[in-house]
């Protein structure tokens, strides 16, 4: 009954967020790709348009490097990123799978209400983050801003989040292919990485006027052929800390290659038809059963925690609760300007970014790694059951298609599936977590970003190839 009341409660609120209509005519693949490209362009534009009316303060970015992982922009309108959309999707999917909210996905009206509920929760999270950012003093104190600019700043941050919700819905309603958040986050990470690899922008590194190229590959090539002192010039680009170094670029390539290789690792479960004798095939059970989804949901929660922790630190810096939860140390050098987490409970949820960070703070590294593995394994099992990937769901699929596992009777198949499928989900989360920790240590958020982007871009690529194959077959 509580679940039914929740769905009915969402119904009047959903009228505030009108539904996007699906295409009225059949769209060709090229048209869908055009819609997807258009949504990506709009999202990128929102990420670079500055916030109007903000005070020019010396406030340091509390999230800094982590923004590449949550789709946010430190100075643009999309400062809240995609974390609210991912978090709302995860929470409602889990609640529905646990029967905490009553949703019958066989009914169109319930599916529509559930999608509207995700939009409403996403919008509420965007509003909460917008109020939190402005209240924290990130854009200036309330006394300097005044009530009008205070409200205007909140609206400027909140409304792009609503636009982002609709960009995702446009893609998922049939105008595009696959998942909207997957496409937008993948494009955001990929765009940031390409900029840090190939950018021709130069930035100063010291007061003497020396500068370097933003792009690691461009900088390496320039330093290799432009300076007589090769050792000194190459060292500055190979191991720099204020941007993507060339060594980190090589680590990113290794992370990409490792992930793409493991995509093909699987166990083939032999199955046969219960109706036609002699017909055998394999049911592939991938090592990356839940891919990077648990990791993304962990980061979406962490993104919210970082914003709330920063607001608490800004408003009550000396309180006992603040010191227990979060402690910052400002890094304000000529080349770097950021707030770095150095203590508190939230600190142990933040990844060690850099080899020196991991070696100098081994307790943090160990606690974070163990915590990440435990949380992602738990999320992986939750997501497995929430998305019809659990043992009972697979068994139902077999029964509907009159398939049985070779060597097992229909009555004993569930026990076998309950052995192998949860193990696959746990191994998937464990491997992705370990790879993300290694990538973070040796290539900062660039390495973790490559890991996530590889999975998201590959998922989008599979959708495009599948759609193209269907069109080629006349479906």
UniProtKB/Swiss-Prot annotation:
InterPro entries with a match to the protein in the record: SecY/SEC61-alpha, SecY_dom_sf, Translocon_Sec61/SecY_plug_dom
Any Pfam family matching the protein: Plug_translocon
Superkingdom of source: Eukaryota
Gene Ontology cellular component annotations, sorted alphabetically: Sec61 translocon complex
Transmembrane spans: none
UniProt GO BP: post-translational protein targeting to membrane, translocation; protein insertion into ER membrane; SRP-dependent cotranslational protein targeting to membrane, translocation
Record-linked PANTHER family: SECY/SEC61-ALPHA FAMILY MEMBER
Protein name: Uncharacterized protein C19G7.17
